[in-house]
């Protein structure tokens, strides 16, 4: 079972439940050697830090003394780990040595027998850059083994949860095919395999593309595990692309070679020996100086280095979780990707997949948009804004540039005369910003530094294309001035209600349709006494919409929900639920994923939605936590947080 608790980018703060045990994601599974004598870091420390470990069932199977303990007392006793134990099946050994002394079904049986929580099929880990023919042949064998493993588990009623590994080498179409085929099988977790050689060679562009092309075809309701990823510098980007789990022995292997992990890269202990203190405040680094560690006996030094590496690894995981909660994961990704030029390649390549990534990125966030570099121009918030400009049905447009010294929101810092012409400001980051929506997220909830000329020119093509597509609506300055002078007269000015013009455009931008045309004259607004900004939209003194202060989104009250239901064609902005939960929805209780039977296919996370039954009767209204695909695929967790229900009279 997997559910999403919080999200940002494609990253998910989630909860996996397996055999009555819980794993909070994203997280890393420390590799634990099945032989306790060969384990560098004490299992007591790992029990404190981690919800889950990964160990090797193949080594356990082929080592008689380990196998005996595991078969008699179980893998948890052998490793000393209390929570979720995941095992590899020998695929790693297969990739290194070319063969293993176990049959695919043998290792499935063995993983079940020793009480593994999550086992792994014996897939074929196809190396990067092999011929397409070889990659396809090995992929077909992996498919066969996957089907046989699922069948084996079902036929024998095994409790074992299974990893179904996505392969395909560096052939992206094969990765997509693998994800699609494996995704149709009943696996609990989907690892993306055979990427370690790419990471070792700093081929992060290809790693990013493999992750994205796999994610495109994997079910959204299952966790994704990036096999072999253990360096903290890569976690933020991988999480932002939708990876939930990582594993690695890097913490121990690096320590063996005297290497000291940081969230930005790797240092050798020799590079630190002249420092008074370590650049870290973990338990190890607080207790010892670099010189003290350097002068220790090899085994003790290795153990302490491994402990530091483990601490810094989990510290980065915690930092990512916090970034997801705060809605600033993209900023952390951009910071981390500047730690190495090749990692920056891994970030830059994702811009070509932004139409896919945008579907998973929340429409509003706790944190504002922080511009940290040229790559910020390609973020989903900007991509979505440019797409949603097409929702605004302009009649007359005036496009203009303004001084860079004028702060956002522009409408509050310009002397703009109300009229029926939509004024669009050329903006270096967002392309075009209509004054009537410029308070909405992220158009004024942002921090942007002074830009270089090449950054200022980034949106030139977008602006030119927009002007070309709307040529018949665009006014020149003379015509615009005519409208201004016309509406500047007292008689005409009284015909224009700038507040309701703004609200109308904001609703159109947010919901993609004209909402208040017929009710225009009956509506009024209430302003904040402190800021002077619109806070409520009223109909006969009753609240219809509240303008949320953090993002200026229009949040419907009961009247607003009824208005949206009337104006929006079915199934726009609707989540359709099973009749068994109609009463609960009307009572204002949260809607759970398993009761969703259909929805608007364009929904994004954190949109305001209408909850209806199959007859399109309005039951409730609230905020959806999932996008449209997730709403249809998830079986656990909350789908819509209800704001209010419509009780039957």
Curated annotation (Swiss-Prot):
Binds 1 zinc ion per subunit. One of its GO terms (molecular function) is RNA binding. It comes from the Archaea. Signal peptide: none annotated. It holds the Pfam family PUA. Exchanges the guanine residue with 7-cyano-7-deazaguanine (preQ0) at position 15 in the dihydrouridine loop (D-loop) of archaeal tRNAs. Zn(2+) binds at residues 280, 282, 285. Substrate binds at residues 123, 194. Pathway: tRNA modification; archaeosine-tRNA biosynthesis. It comes from Methanococcus vannielii (strain ATCC 35089 / DSM 1224 / JCM 13029 / OCM 148 / SB). Residues 572-647 form the PUA domain. The active site is at 88 (nucleophile). PANTHER family: QUEUINE TRNA-RIBOSYLTRANSFERASE. Belongs to the archaeosine tRNA-ribosyltransferase family. This is tRNA-guanine(15) transglycosylase. Its EC number is 2.4.2.48. GO terms for cellular component: cytoplasm. It is an enzyme of class 2 (transferase). The keyword tRNA processing applies. HAMAP family: TgtA_arch. One of its GO terms (biological process) is tRNA wobble guanine modification. Its cofactor is Zn(2+). Gene3D superfamilies: ArcTGT, C1 domain (3.90.1020.10), ArcTGT, C2 domain (3.10.450.90), PUA domain (2.30.130.10), Queuine tRNA-ribosyltransferase-like (3.20.20.105). It catalyses: guanosine(15) in tRNA + 7-cyano-7-deazaguanine = 7-cyano-7-carbaguanosine(15) in tRNA + guanine. Keywords: Glycosyltransferase, Metal-binding, Transferase, tRNA processing, Zinc.
């Amino acid at each position: 079972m997997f559910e999403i608790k919080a999200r940002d980018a494609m990253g998910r703060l989630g909860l996996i439940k397996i055999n009555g045990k819980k794993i909070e994601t994203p997280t890393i599974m420390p590799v634990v050697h099945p032989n306790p004598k060969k384990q560098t870091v004490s299992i007591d420390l790992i029990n404190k830090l981690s919800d889950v470990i990964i160990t090797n069932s193949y080594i356990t199977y082929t080592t008689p003394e380990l196998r005996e303990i595991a078969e008699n007392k179980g893998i948890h006793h052998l490793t000393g780990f209390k929570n979720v134990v995941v095992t590899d099946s020998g695929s790693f050994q297969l990739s290194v040595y070319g063969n293993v002394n176990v049959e695919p079904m043998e290792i499935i049986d063995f993983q079940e027998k020793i009480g593994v929580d999550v086992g792994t099929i014996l897939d074929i880990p196809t190396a990067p850059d092999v011929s397409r023919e070889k990659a396809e042949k090995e992929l077909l064998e992996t498919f066969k083994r996957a089907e046989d493993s699922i069948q084996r588990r079902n036929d024998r009623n095994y409790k074992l949860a299974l990893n179904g590994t996505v392969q395909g080498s560096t052939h992206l179409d094969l990765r997509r095919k693998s994800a699609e085929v494996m995704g149709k099988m009943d696996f609990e977790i989907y690892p993306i395999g055979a990427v370690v050689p790419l990471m070792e060679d700093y081929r992060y562009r290809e790693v990013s593309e493999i992750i994205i092309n796999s994610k495109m075809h994997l079910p959204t309701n299952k966790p994704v595990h990036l096999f072999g990823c253990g360096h903290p510098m890569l976690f933020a980007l991988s999480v932002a692309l939708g990876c939930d789990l990582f594993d690695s022995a890097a913490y121990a292997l690096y320590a063996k070679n005297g290497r000291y992990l940081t969230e930005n890269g790797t240092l050798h202990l020799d590079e630190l020996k002249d420092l008074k203190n370590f650049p870290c405040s973990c338990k190890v680094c607080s207790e010892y100086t670099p010189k003290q560690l350097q002068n220790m006996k090899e085994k003790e030094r290795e153990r302490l280095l491994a402990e530091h590496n483990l601490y810094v690894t989990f510290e980065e995981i915690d930092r990512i979780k916090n970034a997801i909660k705060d809605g600033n994961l993209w900023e952390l990704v951009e910071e981390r990707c500047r730690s190495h030029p090749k990692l920056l390649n891994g970030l830059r390549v994702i811009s070509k997949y932004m139409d896919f990534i945008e579907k998973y990125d929340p429409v509003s966030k706790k944190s504002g948009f922080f511009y940290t570099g040229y790559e910020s121009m390609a973020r989903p918030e900007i991509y979505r804004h440019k797409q949603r400009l097409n929702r605004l049905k302009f009649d007359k447009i005036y496009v203009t540039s303004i001084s860079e010294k004028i702060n956002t929101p522009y409408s509050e810092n310009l002397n703009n005369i109300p009229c029926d012409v939509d004024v669009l400001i050329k903006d270096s980051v967002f392309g075009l910003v209509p004054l009537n929506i410029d308070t909405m997220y992220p158009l004024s909830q942002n921090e942007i530094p002074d830009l270089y000329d090449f950054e200022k020119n980034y949106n030139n093509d977008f602006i030119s294309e927009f002007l070309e597509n709307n040529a018949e609506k665009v006014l020149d300055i003379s015509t615009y001035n005519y409208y201004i002078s016309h509406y500047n007269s007292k008689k005409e000015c009284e015909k224009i209600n700038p507040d309701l013009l703004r609200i109308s455009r904001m609703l159109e931008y947010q919901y993609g349709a004209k909402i208040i045309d017929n009710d225009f004259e009956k509506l009024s607004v209430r302003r904040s006494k402190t800021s002077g900004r619109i806070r409520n939209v009223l109909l006969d003194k009753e609240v219809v919409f509240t303008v949320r202060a953090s993002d200026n989104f229009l949040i419907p009250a009961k009247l607003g929900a009824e208005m949206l239901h009337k104006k929006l064609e079915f199934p726009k902005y609707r989540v359709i639920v099973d009749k068994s939960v109609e009463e609960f929805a009307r009572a204002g209780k949260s809607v759970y994923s398993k009761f969703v039977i259909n929805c608007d296919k364009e929904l994004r996370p954190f949109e305001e939605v209408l909850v209806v039954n199959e007859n399109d009767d309005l039951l409730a209204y609230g905020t959806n936590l999932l996008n449209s695909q997730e709403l249809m695929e998830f079986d656990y967790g909350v789908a819509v947080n209800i704001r209010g229900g419509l009780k039957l009279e």
